[in-house]
């Protein structure tokens, strides 16, 4: 694996595998693919991680196609093994929603299913050997576009990109705001922030504690999307880094370590998708509660 990239030292190899394929606007006004991490950083807000965007959208399309195919082929007869597996996933997610979400919305179950399967597929990419697809990308970049193969970056695990995880968590945050205001109204939503957790009966004390309540509740409220994003990103990034470190070891040690870690990582992959889904359901359930 790593031994094939003779020109890269171990730190360079790690940095190369943790760098995204970035397209954006340089300080001089030109648009280009970044050839180094420093160039990507200089692009600022205009930087687009093409690999993360491509894989996340592609996996989303695969998810939709698979479920569409199963839905079209579904019948009252004996289901196929694949159809049975899909039905088990749907029943599991639907049961989780029924047990956790106590409001009335037809959106929650499809949303939870989308989150769970989509994140699971993105996480699942972490089980592909770290060099396989990046080496193909480097070969194509060098032979088709004349690029330096060491400057071709191609990460394949979208959930190790904080931009992807933060984007998903911000989408959930928007839904939390929507449900909170829809169920409680603007006044009720603001009142919930201003009058909790301290709500004494004395009107003077109540007024004095409003700033304290607002600070505490706003910090808690705004921490939800951040914690959602960082929890998923941190766990998947750490898992990918361990695979990269294993790839730096001699070939005979790689298999002895990578196989047990991959088996354990299957649990991490599934658990992180489940946690993100369940926290989303819990947050939306809290937003839908009327006090």
From Swiss-Prot:
One term under GO cellular component: plasma membrane
Xref: Pfam families: ATP-synt_A
Kindly indicate whether the keyword Transit peptide belongs to this entry.
Answer: no
The source's domain of life comes to Bacteria
Membrane-spanning regions, if any? 50-70, 108-128, 161-181, 203-223, 241-261, 262-282
| Gene Ontology molecular function, alphabetical | proton-transporting ATP synthase activity, rotational mechanism
Per the record, membrane topology reads: Multi-pass membrane protein
* Broad class of the protein's primary localization: membrane
> Would the keyword Ion transport be found if you checked this record's keyword annotation?
yes
Biological process (GO), any one: proton motive force-driven plasma membrane ATP synthesis
Keyword terms: ATP synthesis, Cell inner membrane, Cell membrane, CF(0), Hydrogen ion transport, Ion transport, Membrane, Transmembrane, Transmembrane helix, Transport
Question: Where does the record say this protein resides?
Answer: Cell inner membrane
Similarity comment: family membership: Belongs to the ATPase A chain family.
Note the subunit structure.
F-type ATPases have 2 components, CF(1) - the catalytic core - and CF(0) - the membrane proton channel. CF(1) has five subunits: alpha(3), beta(3), gamma(1), delta(1), epsilon(1). CF(0) has three main subunits: a(1), b(2) and c(9-12). The alpha and beta chains form an alternating ring which encloses part of the gamma chain. CF(1) is attached to CF(0) by a central stalk formed by the gamma and epsilon chains, while a peripheral stalk is formed by the delta and b chains.
Q: What does this protein do?
A: Key component of the proton channel; it plays a direct role in the translocation of protons across the membrane.
The UniProt entry, under PANTHER family, shows:
ATP SYNTHASE SUBUNIT A, CHLOROPLASTIC
Q: What is this protein called?
A: ATP synthase subunit a
- Please report the organism this UniProt entry assigns to the protein: Acinetobacter baumannii (strain SDF)
